């Protein structure tokens, strides 16, 4: 046996190997089983039988141990290293690459998308065994320069809107904005945000997509904020899902709508707290008195709107 990393504690390796693994090792003595020992209880687990490619990757990862921090998501060089493994014939390496790239920030996913072969994306999108991995492929599809891929994004989003499906909707909505920019935001407004019949899970998926883009691209914050405004006009109950972004972007011009939503949601203490936090920030930033709380959804008086920087 060979120790790849760490220091053996001298305890015997007690591990059950199934019959298939034993037969494979007997037939291919050059192969080995990779084992890992738990630092917590000393127990052993199997990481799989080696193939030449799998062994090379395991050894290479261990060599990088000093440079890679646990659970880091913003190491561009590390992400670049895993890109060639996405779509690898060895499913374990393919999964490993997905787990690394799939937790990267959206900006990194966009950067890497052009390096993923079209065939790999098609496999991730179309094969049922990759259903739970589909979101990453959808986000990357949104970065494609191929018109067929861009058309697929538009058509899939339209179909989801038609059938009221929220499965992977956040990813498809994100891809649509990547494809069509501000026009895509407008499309999401008309299909979802201003549609009174939409369910909350659909609306929250679209909010997530818009938020991702506005965080990644400051030039989209203004159109996204206006989309939020129209959403609040139609679905004020979703105000708690928006105030984090509004605070981060210092958009204090939503006071009237947030105040109305706060009064309407007064039975939900968490909603009241988050909306009240926005209103307190707005009051502090605007240098005016805290708006008076009202019952129902009555709009602030003209004098209140003037104090808060809005035109009466």
Where are these regions (language model features)?
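Mixed-charge (acidic/basic) macromolecular-recognition segments
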Residues: 81-91, 96-103
């Amino acid at each position: 046996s060979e120790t790849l990393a760490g220091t053996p504690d001298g305890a015997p390796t007690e591990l059950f190997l199934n019959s298939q693994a034993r037969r494979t090792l007997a037939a291919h003595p050059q192969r080995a089983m990779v084992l890992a020992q738990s630092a917590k209880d000393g127990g052993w687990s199997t990481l799989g039988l080696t193939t030449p490619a799998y062994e090379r990757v395991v050894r290479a990862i261990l060599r990088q141990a000093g440079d890679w921090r646990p659970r880091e998501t913003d190491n561009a060089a590390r992400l670049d290293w895993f890109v060639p493994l996405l779509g690898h014939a060895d499913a374990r390496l393919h999964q490993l690459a997905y787990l690394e790239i799939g937790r990267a920030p959206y900006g990194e996913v966009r950067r890497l998308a052009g390096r993923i072969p079209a065939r790999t994306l098609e496999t991730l999108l179309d094969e049922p065994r990759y259903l739970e991995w589909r979101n990453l492929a959808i986000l990357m599809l949104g970065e494609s320069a191929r018109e067929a891929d861009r058309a697929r994004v538009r058509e899939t989003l339209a179909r989801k809107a038609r059938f009221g499906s929220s499965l992977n909707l956040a990813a498809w909505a994100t891809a649509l904005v990547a494809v069509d920019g501000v026009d895509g935001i407008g499309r999401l407004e008309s299909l979802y945000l201003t549609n009174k019949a939409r369910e909350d899970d659909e609306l929250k998926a679209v909010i997530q997509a818009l938020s991702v883009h506005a965080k990644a691209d400051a030039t989209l914050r203004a159109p996204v904020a206006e989309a939020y405004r129209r959403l609040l006009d139609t679905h004020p109950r979703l105000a708690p899902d928006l105030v984090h972004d509004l605070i981060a972007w210092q958009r204090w011009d939503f006071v009237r709508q947030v105040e109305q939503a706060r009064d309407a949601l007064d039975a939900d203490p968490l909603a009241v707290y988050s909306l009240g936090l926005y209103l307190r920030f707005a009051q502090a930033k605007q240098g005016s008195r805290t708006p008076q709380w009202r019952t129902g959804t009555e709009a602030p008086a003209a004098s209140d709107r003037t104090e808060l920087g809005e035109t009466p």
